[in-house]
């Protein structure tokens, strides 16, 4: 099967890495995967193609904006690939009623915006696939985990970089500010003399974007002055192929997920990617949801507003215990989320 992804490809975004993983494993199962477009010099390992006739399936991967090709390319794709050969992946929960959590994170700002998304999806395909472990809410919806885990990518501690940070967070400030302010910052403030370097790597932690059309300002809302008071470092994002190595430079990595996707029980690549690193992942997730993804051992890695201090300080004091917990989670991921299973699920969904 020849599978062409149509998506906004960015070197510092998880979904580009996820599709790159499929490119790597697809030949083992007799498939070929590429992203629509022309080769980019800064992404040399990504397979690009604009030869639509070479592909028999197309996957439209949507995030938080309706990504459109040029009219000529869009017409070529639709003209060469029948409706039954098109798949939609709804990564950011747009194919849902308007959801607004505590006046903060939301999938749509207005009902009119939601209608535009629904109409666009329905024009392309009969079904909408979602990377969720929640049951479908309607006849057009199909759960498809999509993201997978490859034990071969785990970092060998012997080859890992030196641990120069106590705590690291790798990811953009896109609806993450409240969780960080509520869960992590009080712990750092109370224990600053006991905690070493803390760094946030990603966009918009030091300041929100200034370019027009960046999105709802609430998505970037954050007390950046708190970072200065607590001597927390910031750094621009790294390329997707540097993420695991970067995370391995810290004793602890904090995992956060934007609230609306957590509410919808959507998975993201970071759920799996963080366990490739030589680090202790601590997860700002609902404990039952985490156990459903990672197995029961993950309950020992959960951070809550009330329990974050005890967990973080214990992980710094007893790293070997937490490394054993991480190994339990890795074994669960290898058994239940391997790419052989993921590739089979994707191929089956494209054939159905």
Give the ranges of each region predicted by the language model:
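N-terminal Rossmann-like NAD(P) cofactor-binding module of classical short-chain dehydrogenase/reductase
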Residues: 59
């Amino acid at each position: 099967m020849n599978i062409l992804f149509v998506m906004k490809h960015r070197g510092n975004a998880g979904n580009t890495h996820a599709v790159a993983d499929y490119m790597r494993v697809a030949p083992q199962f007799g498939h070929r995967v590429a992203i629509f477009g022309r080769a980019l010099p800064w992404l040399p390992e990504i397979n690009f193609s604009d030869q639509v006739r070479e592909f028999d399936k197309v996957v439209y991967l949507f995030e938080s904006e309706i990504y459109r090709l040029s009219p000529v390319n869009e017409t070529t794709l639709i003209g060469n690939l029948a409706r039954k050969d098109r798949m939609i992946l709804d990564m950011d929960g747009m194919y849902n009623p308007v959801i607004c959590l505590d006046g903060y994170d939301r999938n749509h700002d207005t009902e009119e915006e939601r209608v535009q998304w629904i109409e666009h999806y329905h024009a392309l395909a009969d079904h909408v696939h979602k990377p969720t472990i929640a049951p479908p809410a309607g006849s057009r919806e199909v759960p498809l985990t999509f993201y997978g885990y490859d034990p071969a990518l785990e970092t060998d501690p012997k080859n890992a970089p030196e641990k120069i940070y106590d705590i690291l967070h790798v990811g953009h400030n896109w609806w993450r500010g409240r969780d960080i302010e509520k869960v992590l910052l009080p712990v750092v403030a109370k224990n600053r003399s006991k905690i070493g370097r803390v760094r946030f790597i990603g966009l918009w932690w030091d300041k929100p974007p200034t370019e027009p059309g960046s999105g709802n300002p609430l998505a970037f809302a954050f007390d950046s002055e708190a970072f200065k008071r607590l001597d927390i470092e910031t750094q621009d994002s790294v390329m997707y192929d540097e993420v695991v190595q970067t995370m391995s430079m810290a004793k602890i990595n904090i995992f956060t997920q934007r609230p609306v996707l957590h509410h919808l029980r959507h998975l993201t690549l970071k759920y799996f990617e963080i366990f490739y690193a030589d680090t202790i992942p601590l997860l700002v997730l609902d404990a039952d949801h985490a156990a459903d993804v990672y197995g029961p051992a993950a309950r020992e890695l959960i951070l809550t507003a009330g329990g974050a201090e005890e967990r973080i300080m214990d992980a710094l004091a007893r790293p070997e215990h937490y490394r054993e917990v991480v190994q339990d989670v890795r074994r669960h991921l290898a058994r239940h989320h391997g790419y052989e299973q993921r590739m089979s699920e994707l191929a089956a969904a494209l054939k159905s």
